[in-house]
Amino acid sequence: MEKEMLAIARLKSGEGKFEKFMGWMQSDKGMAVRKTIAHVEKTVPAIAPDKSYVMFKVSVHNEEEMKKFASGNNPIAKPIFDECIEIVQMYDLSKVKL
């Protein structure tokens, strides 16, 4: 079952954390992990003007693995999360009829 979620990741302070994290997310390794969790082609990113946090609207197909990934407990993603991510907050999204 596909589920829309919002992830807001606050980056640790320090030079180049944003670039390093986003580089990993777009790398072959990062894409492979993300594909096991969500439909990457449907992901919508947003970046804070000061690059202190990133936000992703994600179409999740494996919620348990998404929670594991976002909490920094995915074994492949753990090193980059430990180095670059301070905290991630997750939200369930639902469409609003207009």
Regions found by a protein language model. Give the residues of each.
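Short S/T/G/P-rich N-terminal loop/turn motif that feeds into the first structured element of a domain
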Residues: 1-78, 86-98
